[in-house]
Structures are given as structure tokens and as C-alpha cells.
Amino acid sequence: DVYKRQFVGIVGLIDPPRDEAITAIADCRTAGITVKMITGDHKDTAAAIARQLHLADDPKAMTGAELDEVAEADLPSVARSVSVFARTNPEHKLRIVRALQSNGQVVAMTGDGVNDAPSLKQADVGVAMGRKGTEAAKEAAEMVLANDDFASIVAAVREGRTVYDNIR
């Protein structure tokens, strides 16, 4: 009987962002690189993680359902101003990448699943995860991260900029 049950307790778990991720985001921001989070997580959870990562000074979050209500003409400015896109599907990811590109931005997109393949292919630089990534994601991407570490992208950009500066 439901009424004779006794509540014993509750457990909460958290997987906090790694220090390396926080440092990598800070390095991106210092280098003028804007990082967006596109996730299937709940909006409040994603926004809390974005704040822990210092993704933006005041990270704005939007759900895929809210994104569906945005007119195509308004999407580029929304994509520019929103830091976190939560509860998204593959079509949302693709719309976000295209909207950022329409702003003249060079877009690097990371992903590991079959559902990421269309946006990895659309991005200027698709980056798949080498360890946990699916074959579909790896085939759609231009680059595969052998160690699945976001900080590797930051290091690659830094190295590329150094080479570019030395050539000039």
C-alpha cells in the first residue's frame, strides 16, 4: 500500500566541470573566441554549468522549443546573444550553426553522436570525439580529437595563430 511506505532519504549527485575545462573556456574568451553550449540537458542545469564554466559574463539560455518560436530572420541575432541552447535536437543544432555562419562567424562544432553529424558537416570545422564518438560523427567531421579534450581545440587554435603570425 502506498500510504504505508516510509521515505528513507534522497541522494543528489553532481559532476562538476573539470578545472581544465574552465581554464580552456577562459583561454577561449581571452583569445576572442565565443563558446556556445548546445545540449540535451534541462535549461536550468545547462545554465548552471555555463555559469560554473564562466561561459559568458551573464549566460543567456534558451530551449529548443523556444528556438522553434524564433523567426528565421531573427535567428542570427538570437544565436549571437544566447550562450546556452538546452533540450535541443539535431535540427536545432543545424539552425544554430547556420545562423552563426550567417553572422560571418567561423564556426567550429564539436560532437560525438550520430545526431551531431549534420551540424558537424555544416560547421566550418567539424570536430568529433575520437574515444566516445560514433563513426558517423567521425566521418562527418574534419578533425577528430584523439583525447576527447576540449582544451586540445584551444591549443590547436593557439598553435595555428602562432604559425599564421610567423608567416605574416
Can you describe what each PLM-predicted range is?
Residues 34, 106, 125:
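Residues at the starts of beta-strands that form the adenosine-phosphate
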Residues 1-99, 103, 117, 131, ...:
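Cytosolic catalytic headpieces and adjacent flexible linkers of membrane translocases
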Residues 73-76, 101, 121-125, 131-168:
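Non-transmembrane, extramembrane segments of multi-pass ion/lipid transporters
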Residues 47, 108, 153-154:
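Short helix/loop capping segments that flank catalytic or ligand/cofactor-binding pockets
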